[in-house]
Amino acid sequence: DTSTGSASVDWHATAVTLTITPSATSSKILVSFDGQVYVQNTSGDAGIALKISRTIGSTTTSPDALHTKSAANYSAHYTQQTYGQFAFRAPLSGLDSPNTTSEITYKLYFIPYNVNGAGINSMNGRSTLTLMEIDGS
């Protein structure tokens, strides 16, 4: 359960993480997240964006294929004019090309906007992160 009490300009790390070691440098990794997100607000629009980072050794990156925020685009967004507290599914998947046979750790992050509270797996939610190696030769 990861949550924050306010809107932010920073990405929040979650406990949703998984590791895989590809068998070939040409392998692709299908990364698939399906989970419950939570947002709460007292007025106006509110939303949440997701991204999955990739760590190989000591280098962490956020591949474009695993990112839902582009300018004002958020993966899960709702509009409301009065107090609201909502939990809903927010899937994210992408095909990564890490070009390595070293261990890779994928980790979910979120960033909320215009909220009093937001999080992943709040309100008894569950999330899954699935990694599948695909032959890239």
What residues fall within each predicted segment?
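Terminal beta-strand-rich extracellular "head" domains
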Residues: 1-6, 10, 21-103, 107-137
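Short, solvent-exposed loop/turn segments enriched in Ser/Thr/Gly
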Residues: 12-14
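Extended, low-complexity regulatory regions
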Residues: 16-18
